[in-house]
Design a protein with these regions (language model features):
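Active-site-adjacent structural elements that line small-molecule/cofactor binding pockets in enzymes
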Residues: 1-276
Length: 276
C-alpha cells in the first residue's frame, strides 16, 4: 500500500513547502490538499464528519493549486494531489490549464482527485444548481480531457460548451494525470466506473461495508484502476485488511499546526504504516 498525508494548509499553519519537504524526507508517496473556494456563513448543508460548527481551517485554507505548486517546487519525488478539487464549481478551461501546468512543472507528479462537493450553498454561489452538480462534474471532466489530449479541442454539452480552442502546455503524463473520483454515496462505485476513474472514497467506519464496495469496484474495473482511501484510522491491522481487499493507497490527516507539531504526527504515521 502506498502511503500519503493530507493537511488543511492555512495562513496560520505550517507552510506548503515545509510540509512537502518533511513528507518527502519521511518517504511518503504523496501529499494531498483539499479544496474549498469559500465557506458560506449561512448554510444548511452538513459536513459528512462535523454536524455542528465547521472547523476553523475550512474557513482559511489556501488555494489548492497555488499551495500544490509550492509543494512541487520544494520536492523532487513526492506525488502531489488534490484531495479533492471541487470541480463542479471550477471553470473547466481555466482548471485544465492549471492541471496541465502543475503536471508539467512537477515533472509528471500530479494526481487529480475530483468531486462534486458536499456544501450545496458553496456550489450554488458559483452559479451551479446543486442538484446538477454531478452532471456538471462529468461534463467538466470530459471537456478537460478533450483540452488535454487534442491540439484543437472543442466540447458541446448541456453545461459546458466551447468552440475549437488551443491550450498548452499539455500534461506531462499521458494521456493526462490520473483522475480519482472522490465519492461515498450509494452510486459512488457506479459513477467511478462510468467515468473510468480511480476511486477515492472517504473512510467508512464499517470496515465490512467498505470492503464490499471496494470488491464491487475492483470487479467492475478488473483491477485496471486503483482505490485510494482518504483518512482511514491509524490502525495497522485494519489497514492491512483494507490493503488485502484492494486499497492500494491511503492518506492520513496531519494537524493544521506549525511544523513541529506536524512533524510529530508525520513520525507517528510513518512508524505505524512502515512496510504495509
Amino acid at each position: 500500500m502506498k502511503v500519503g498525508v493530507t493537511i488543511f494548509l492555512t495562513d496560520e499553519s505550517a507552510r506548503a513547502e515545509e510540509v512537502a519537504k518533511l513528507a518527502e524526507l519521511y518517504e511518503f508517496e504523496s501529499l494531498w490538499l483539499p479544496d474549498h473556494t469559500h465557506i458560506p456563513s449561512l448554510r444548511k448543508s452538513q459536513h459528512p464528519l462535523f454536524k455542528d460548527e465547521i472547523p476553523r481551517e475550512y474557513l482559511r485554507m489556501l488555494d489548492v493549486f497555488v499551495a500544490l505548486t509550492m509543494a512541487a517546487a520544494a520536492t523532487k519525488r513526492l506525488a502531489i494531489g488534490t484531495g479533492i478539487c471541487v470541480l463542479s464549481q471550477r471553470d473547466p478551461i481555466v482548471t485544465a490549464k492549471a492541471v496541465a501546468s502543475l503536471d508539467f512543472v512537477s515533472n509528471g507528479r500530479f494526481l487529480f482527485g475530483v468531486g462534486a462537493g458536499w456544501n450545496l450553498e458553496e456550489v450554488a454561489n458559483h452559479g451551479i444548481d446543486p442538484n446538477d452538480r454531478f452532471k456538471v462534474l462529468v461534463e467538466r471532466i470530459e471537456a478537460m480531457q478533450a483540452i488535454w489530449t487534442q491540439d484543437v479541442a472543442s466540447y458541446s454539452g448541456h453545461f459546458v460548451s466551447f468552440e475549437e480552442i488551443w491550450s498548452w502546455p499539455k500534461p506531462l503524463q499521458s494521456p493526462h494525470p490520473p483522475i480519482l473520483l472522490g465519492a461515498n454515496g450509494p452510486r459512488a462505485v457506479e459513477r467511478a466506473v462510468k467515468l473510468g476513474a480511480h476511486w477515492l472514497p472517504g473512510y467508512h467506519k464499517d470496515d465490512n461495508y467498505l470492503i464490499s464496495r471496494i470488491l464491487e469496484y475492483r470487479k467492475c474495473t478488473e483491477d485496471q484502476l486503483g482505490v485510494t482511501l482518504s483518512m482511514p484510522p491509524l490502525d495497522r491491522s485494519r489497514l492491512a485488511r483494507l490493503a488485502d481487499a484492494g486499497v492500494d493507497r491511503a492518506f492520513f490527516l496531519l494537524p493544521t499546526a506549525k511544523i513541529d507539531e506536524v512533524e510529530q504526527r508525520i513520525d507517528e504515521i510513518r512508524h505505524i504504516t512502515a512496510d504495509l
